[in-house]
């Protein structure tokens, strides 16, 4: 009687070691294990590389890494992974009890359930309509960027034609012409560019036929009496301050973006890209190396004194070379630390009357860049990567510095037409690209679990 019992026990042990008995090769549980959790596969999902994982393991991996690649071989997958139905049915038939227990454990884990939901939502966004949506999305994305490239090509051709046809007129600007050679019409043009208020004195300068040489001889006393009769002391002060700058330079100083670009093509391109990619370092550069000509007018424009904020126009603020007060420094440093792009937007806002569309492009781009910066900070905080901030800051500083040094070294070799294309690309096309980046960040944020 004891021997049959021993035979029964040995047979049960063999059944436990080999749950599936057949006339062919025997199958063990380890052959159907996930390479992430090393347990029986639940809803096995097979990637393009051929590796299979539990769907919730793949979702957890995607949530933590934000990468669409295989956890084992790191090969990127295409499309959105789906459950391997044939493999799932086979495992459920071979190990029904183990699968049932694992499914119950998964359903009771809120983190896993939320990760699966976010992962599935990400897949729905990738394929919202039909199985062929992936190809449609690729065509749609390709169509968008091909449209941008087509527009850029068209603009480049227009700029090429304009560059060759307007070369003489560009050199004919007052910023390139000696003041003693100005005509009466050019003197009036210089006067009108001081501000809307200067149109009050336009006819007086025309009637007196004031040319460049005569302009250089005028004094404050002559401006205050007939025939000029400029009674407003603020207007006289602005005209005299600007006249002193003209006398010192010998030409008209730049008073808008296009004149500044004509006089300083390299610096304008450098500042545009520096303030776009790294506004804090760009403003620090202005403070250290261009304090009087650029930084002082900038801080007086964006952080004006209370008594001057309503009475002065933009040109008067540009001529204000007084040292900033502590109140101005405090306002500037707060915005500089937390919202640097707002400083650029506020500066562009004051130029709306002079540059109607260009200022609006700059304001929109500054808003978009602020949103992208907030997304970057949120990503660092949500991933608990605050310790990497110093290293990121150093890498960013090194990248911007090397790019600036590279540009300074090779600037004489770069054709002016290429520089113009880069300038207009950053000015007008960069906001379109940033809109697309913000939309992608918002969609990515919707798939994250809070």
Swiss-Prot record:
PTM comment, free text: Mediates RING-dependent self-ubiquitination leading to proteasomal degradation.
Cellular component terms (Gene Ontology): endoplasmic reticulum; endoplasmic reticulum membrane; membrane
TM ranges: 141-161, 332-352, 361-381, 405-425
Topology of this chain in the membrane: Multi-pass membrane protein
SUPFAM superfamilies listed in its UniProt record: RING/U-box (SSF57850), SAM/Pointed domain (SSF47769)
Membrane topology, Extracellular segments: 162-331, 382-404
EC number(s) given by UniProt: 2.3.2.27
Statement: the UniProt record of this protein carries the keyword Disulfide bond: no
Catalytic reaction list: S-ubiquitinyl-[E2 ubiquitin-conjugating enzyme]-L-cysteine + [acceptor protein]-L-lysine = [E2 ubiquitin-conjugating enzyme]-L-cysteine + N(6)-ubiquitinyl-[acceptor protein]-L-lysine
GO molecular function: caspase binding; protein-macromolecule adaptor activity; ubiquitin protein ligase activity; zinc ion binding
UniProt main location, coarse: endoplasmic reticulum
Region called Disordered, residue ranges: 1-24
Source organism superkingdom: Eukaryota
Compartments where found: Endoplasmic reticulum membrane
Biological role stated in the UniProt entry: Membrane-bound E3 ubiquitin ligase that plays a role in several processes including apoptosis regulation or reticulum endoplasmic stress. Has anti-apoptotic activity, both for apoptosis triggered via death-receptors and via mitochondrial factors. Contributes to the dynamic control of IRE1/ERN1 signaling during ER stress by inducing BAX inhibitor 1/TMBIM6 proteasomal degradation. Promotes the activation of TGF-beta signaling by mediating the 'Lys-63'-linked ubiquitination of TGFBR1 which is critical to activate the pathway.
Subunit description: Interacts with CASP8, BCL2 and BCL2L1 through SAM domain and also with HIP1, IFT57, ESRRBL1 and BCAP31. Interacts with NGFR; this interaction inhibits NF-kappa-B and JNK-related signaling pathways.
Protein known as: Bifunctional apoptosis regulator
Organism, as annotated: Rattus norvegicus (Rat)
């Amino acid at each position: 009687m004891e021997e049959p019992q021993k035979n029964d026990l040995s047979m049960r042990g063999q059944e436990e070691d080999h749950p599936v008995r057949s006339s062919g090769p025997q199958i063990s549980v380890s052959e159907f294990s996930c390479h992430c959790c090393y347990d029986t596969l639940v809803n096995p999902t097979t990637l393009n590389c051929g590796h299979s994982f539990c769907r919730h393991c793949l979702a957890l991996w995607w949530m933590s890494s934000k990468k669409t690649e295989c956890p084992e071989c790191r090969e990127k997958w295409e499309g959105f992974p789906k459950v391997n139905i044939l493999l799932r049915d086979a495992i459920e038939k071979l190990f029904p009890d183990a699968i049932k227990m694992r499914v119950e454990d998964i359903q009771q884990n809120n983190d896993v359930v939320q990760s699966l939901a976010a992962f599935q939502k990400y897949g729905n966004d990738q394929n919202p309509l039909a199985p062929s949506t992936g190809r449609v999305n690729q065509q749609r994305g390709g169509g968008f960027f091909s449209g941008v490239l087509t527009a850029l090509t068209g603009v480049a051709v227009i700029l090429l034609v304009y560059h060759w046809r307007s070369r003489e007129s560009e050199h004919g600007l007052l910023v390139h012409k000696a003041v003693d050679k100005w005509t009466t019409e050019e003197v009036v043009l210089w006067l009108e560019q001081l501000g809307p208020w200067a149109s009050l004195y336009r006819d007086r300068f025309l009637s007196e036929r004031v040319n460049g040489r005569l302009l250089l001889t005028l004094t404050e006393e002559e401006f205050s009496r007939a025939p000029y009769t400029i009674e407003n002391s603020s207007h006289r002060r602005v005209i005299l301050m600007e006249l002193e700058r003209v006398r010192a330079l010998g030409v008209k100083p730049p008073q808008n973006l296009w004149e500044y670009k004509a006089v300083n093509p390299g610096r304008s391109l450098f500042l545009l890209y520096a303030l776009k990619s790294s506004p804090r370092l760009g403003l620090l550069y202005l403070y250290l190396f261009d304090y009087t000509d650029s930084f002082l007018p900038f801080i007086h424009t964006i952080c004006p004194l209370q008594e001057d904020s309503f009475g002065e126009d933009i040109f008067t603020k540009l001529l204000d070379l007084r040292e900033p007060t502590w109140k101005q420094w405090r306002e500037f440093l707060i915005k500089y630390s937390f919202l640097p792009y707002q400083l650029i937007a506020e500066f562009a806002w004051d130029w709306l009357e002079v540059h109607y569309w260009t200022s609006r492009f700059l304001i929109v781009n500054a808003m978009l860049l602020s949103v992208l910066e907030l997304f970057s900070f949120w990503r660092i905080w949500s991933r608990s990567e605050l310790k990497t901030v110093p290293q990121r800051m150093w890498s960013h500083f090194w990248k911007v510095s090397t790019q600036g040094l590279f540009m300074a070294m090779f600037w004489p070799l770069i054709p002016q037409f290429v520089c113009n294309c880069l300038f207009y690309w950053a000015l007008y096309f960069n906001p379109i690209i940033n809109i697309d980046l913000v939309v992608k960040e918002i969609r990515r944020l919707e798939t994250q679990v809070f």
